[in-house]
């Protein structure tokens, strides 16, 4: 069995990943950014807009399990992978989330990201 990917804990690494490739899905947004040979790493962000602590932690547990399962085989080598939870993600079936993450990782490997959203001012 392969080792689990490392966890991103520093804010600077999360901000750097925001400059990388972005792949949006109904349940989450995947960010992928090269990390200068530090191996596969992952981070999870779920904002308070999603729900209370119980709901956010449940979503993070589901994302963590998916990343442990899929990143070693399908993730980008020497990249940081960030999953940002969306409101629809908590109600989605686990199998559906897995399919969406597999598709998002495939699109990231192909370099096919989604356009950035314009910020409201």
UniProtKB/Swiss-Prot annotation:
Pfam families: Ribonuclease_P. The keyword tRNA processing applies. Keywords: Endonuclease, Hydrolase, Nuclease, RNA-binding, tRNA processing. Coiled coil: none annotated. InterPro entries: Ribosomal_Su5_D2-typ_SF (IPR020568), Ribsml_uS5_D2-typ_fold_subgr (IPR014721), RNase_P (IPR000100). One of its GO terms (molecular function) is tRNA binding. The keyword RNA-binding applies. NCBIfam families: rnpA. RNaseP catalyzes the removal of the 5'-leader sequence from pre-tRNA to produce the mature 5'-terminus. It can also cleave other RNA substrates such as 4.5S RNA. The protein component plays an auxiliary but essential role in vivo by binding to the 5'-leader sequence and broadening the substrate specificity of the ribozyme. Consists of a catalytic RNA component (M1 or rnpB) and a protein subunit. This is Ribonuclease P protein component. It comes from Erythrobacter litoralis (strain HTCC2594). The gene is rnpA.
């Amino acid at each position: 069995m392969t080792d689990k990917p490392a966890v991103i804990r520093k804010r600077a690494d999360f901000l750097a990943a925001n400059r990388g490739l972005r792949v949006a899905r109904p349940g989450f947004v995947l960010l992928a950014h090269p990390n200068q040979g530090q191996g596969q790493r992952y981070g999870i962000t779920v904002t308070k807009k999603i729900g209370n602590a119980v709901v956010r932690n449940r979503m993070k547990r589901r994302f963590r399990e998916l990343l442990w399962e899929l990143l070693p085989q399908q993730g980008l080598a020497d990249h940081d992978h960030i999953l940002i939870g969306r409101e629809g993600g908590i109600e989605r079936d686990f199998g559906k989330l897995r399919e969406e993450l597999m598709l998002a990782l495939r699109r990231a490997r192909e370099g096919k990201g989604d356009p950035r959203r314009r910020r409201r001012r």
